[in-house]
Amino acid sequence: SIYKTKSLLHGLSQVRDRTFYFFWKGDEIPLFEYYNRPNQNMCEMIRSVPSDPADPMNVLTSNKVPSQDDHYYKFILEEICGGITHKEFVASLEPGRSVNPQLYIEKHSDYTKVADWLRKNGNPKAADKALRNAEKIAGGGNLMRRTSEIPSDYTGAFVGHLPMRVTHPDEDRYLTYREAMEFMKLPRDFNIISPKKNLNHICQNVPLTTAADMATNIKRYLEGTCEMIRDDYLIQDNKSKKLVMTNRSSSLEEFLK
């Protein structure tokens, strides 16, 4: 059987599709529970992580300062928003997905204005890059938007550049290793060996709550408390709350008779 879901439905603050495959002995397949837990607010989750000086994971994933070293984010704070702070910008965001500064600029301004501002502030190299972005957008192309990620309710899949580019909601900095690990609900007494080198190991895990939900259903099956469907192959979709069956049962109604 296949169980399709996404992390957000298991109470996490990231949107990430997940598919689990199971092989069952016999000619019946257990029906798993459906999940739709309210997701933990991304900002509150980051704030909840203790700042312990003795914790070896209490080290920044990046020493850059978002409001100063990310040119696009600096443009937003100073030019689009009139000189507000990082904390004020986070507080101004509508509930929803985290904000990528480049997407924000594409919605509220444009790259030619960013280029003019960068050139005026003595950064011609970054200005040229902004102009190339403007040309790509005008030509119908796409961009690699690997800039900062400003937290709100939730974010996209916590992979790739995000562990080094998600900002703290209050402090003008990026995450610590411990805060990054919280996205996957890794135990707070768990440490990564050589975290700078192995940062991506965080992303390669299934979040603890999602994995625990699958394990709970397996436990129910072993205890004999699951509803069973007589079929060879079953797709159970937690996102749509639907079942797709094959040759043994033509419908769920038939199974329930």
What kind of region is each of these model predictions?
Residues 86-257:
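C-terminal target-recognition/interaction regions appended to catalytic cores
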Residues 1-138:
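Class I S-adenosyl-L-methionine
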